[in-house]
Amino acid sequence: ATRRGAGSIETVEMAVKDADGKLLADAIPVVSIAKDGGYSGLEFGDDPSLELDLIASIDHKLGMGRLTGFVVEGLTPYGTNLSQARHKLMLKATFSGIPVAKVGRGTPEGFADPHEFQIAASNLTAIKARLLLMACLLRFGSLPTAKDPDHPTGDELDAIRKAVAAY
């Protein structure tokens, strides 16, 4: 799991099963569905600092020290964010160790555009993508983190890209 530590984001080990092999309640991943729609921005432009709801959600997840993730419900059928500001924040979440899956709205029967740092959950509703992301988090754990999620290095991007591909 990842959490906000003293001045940076750190990776922490966490138990998933008890001595009898049963899933621990605290190990169940916390995966939120973030919806994006047309005209959702409060201001014109692509300033992520104005998207306080997503900033608060990312900060809350990093404060938990648990397995966490996001499913972005965007355009149908492509699953893309309409807002560049919200897309930038979802990339920051990924660079902070929080995996992001993207789906189309409603009951899409198409594809989600592939992205090197986001999971394209093609042919899935947001609920199904959420359950699969929870299973992936239990199997693979959190993504690698960048020391500075706003400015990841090339090596950090390579490690994150490789981990996202495993999902």
Predicted feature descriptions by range:
Residues 1-82:
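Accessory alpha-helical/coil subdomains and C-terminal extensions
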